[in-house]
Amino acid sequence: MQWYVRNHIIDLNIPRIMAIWNVTPDSFSSFCEPELASSTTHAERLCCEGADILDIGAESTRPGSTPVSCEEEQARLQQPLVWAKTHTQCPISLDSRHLKTILWALSMGYVDIINDVGESEEPADEREGVIYRAVRDAGAGLVLMAWNDHGGEILSFEKCVKKIVIQLEKRLQMALDNGVDKRAIVLDPGIGFGKGLDNDMRLIAHAPSALAHLGCPVLIGHSRKRCLAQTVGLPVEKLDAPTAMASAIAFMQGASIVRVHQPALSLYARQIAISCTKHAS
């Protein structure tokens, strides 16, 4: 399986690691790293430690974070995106919910992938249609996330998965109707977006099989999430090893991509998962 993303064709027969570069002061990264998380020094380390894709965001999606305007978001992103485009060979992904920021980054040629992470102020169908046409015209990759929460309702895992499938089926069909190449699309079940901590843990292992019938690769974004903290009883700054353990499980269950803060540990997880899968067959 291959992922067509603007100037790159990413071979997903080998599971891939998307590294998170948050250029924002209130993200999970901001107090967990040995250097300033928003610095190019940090980005260089991510690339050297095994990142296949660099996912850059300037607005935190963690619980309790402060929303930012698209103008502030673009101001934060400008220099990191220029640096990434000129200093790394990795495909560049934009992590954003703002329509104006997504259109700006595509029009400037800064990014290869749009990682659309959430609800914005625009009407959903209108906003997503504009994004999908812009992605189509740029030949960019697209990550479709099930970012709708479940309204505080505690659902069984089966009902949780059903809601995720319905959300992603709708977004996938809308993207295809707007001309996006299916080979450019990856699906994300939206771990940590109001689905319940127990369900989040189960999604790490079971989302790839639950979404397989949609015919797109699956990305698992579990890094430093509350579900891991609850499971192992550790604070967020101690969650990189549990994240890597979960990455190995996700890879072995069919995930094509994991999105993580520390790619080096998930690189080991990938090696173990590939070896175990090979010997199991």
Model-predicted segments: where are they?
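N-terminal carbohydrate-binding accessory modules
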Residues: 1-12
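N-terminal glycine-rich anion-binding loops that anchor highly charged ligand groups
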Residues: 11-19, 23, 45-58
